[in-house]
Structures are given as C-alpha cells and as structure tokens.
C-alpha cells in the first residue's frame, strides 16, 4: 500500500473518530426538562453564556453567546460565538442547524454543526417564566450551560447556580467566563 493511500486512510479514520454524534436514549442521565418552552420566545435572538461546564471546544473562550433564529416550528438556526482570551479578542464562531425533537413541548433541540459531522443534543431543563434565563444540558449529564438575556448580577447568577445544583449537577466545576 502506498504512503499516500495509508495517509488518506489514516486521515479518514481520524475524521470519523472525531465526529461527535448524539447519544442514544440508553445513555440519557440528565433530569427531564421541567417546563414546556415557547419556541418563539426561547429560540430567537441572542443569549449570553454566563456559566458552563468545561469543554475543550470552549477553552480560551469568553463572552460566549448563542444566537437563535426560529425558521419554522421544528427548525432553529444556531450561531454560537465567543471571543478568544478577552471580551475584545478575536471572534470564534460555529453555526449549526437545529431540529426541535419534541414539537409542542420544544425542550429538546438537536443541533448539527460542521455539515452534520458534529451533532449535539441540548435539553432546556429549566427556564424563567419571563424567558430571562434558561439552563441547558445534554442528556448524558456531561454538558451544562446557563444562559441569560442580559449580564446577571452576582446574586442572580448564584440563584441560577443553585438551581443547577438542585437539578443534580456538580456546580463546583462550573466556569464563569468574563462577559461582554
């Protein structure tokens, strides 16, 4: 086998192994979402990422945000952005196409990034009645995000952290990246 062919096969194997897919229901460990979601209110506009569990994809990211556009009753376009290093740093972004998996309740969103090579499921575990914040997680209990419409006060943020702990998450591992 030629070196070119071996290199191509190795690159293909690396690419396939790097693909992240949505978990199977047998891997679900997160709590069930608590309230239905009004898709037009939650899946539209800009949300600030004020806390998260660490992930390699967010290393060095601050001033994170998710921008949602509700396209129709089951499709949401997603643009996740952050700044590298400081709130004035270079922007890093990734866009994806989301599918609401439970129309009507609207608490489960599957987003396909990088032309579908990376797929993540997000559950809206809890939210404010006025849609000023929400807590999102993946169903495997490994990822957790706290989003707000505006930068929260320290007291408001602590309420959201306590709520995340009540949902069963180890909040001692949360990161609080600087905001805008």
Give the ranges of each region predicted by the language model.
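Bacterial N-terminal signal peptides
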Residues: 7-17
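Positively charged n-region of N-terminal signal peptides that target proteins for export
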Residues: 1-5
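A beta-rich soluble binding module of mature secreted/lumenal proteins
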Residues: 19-180
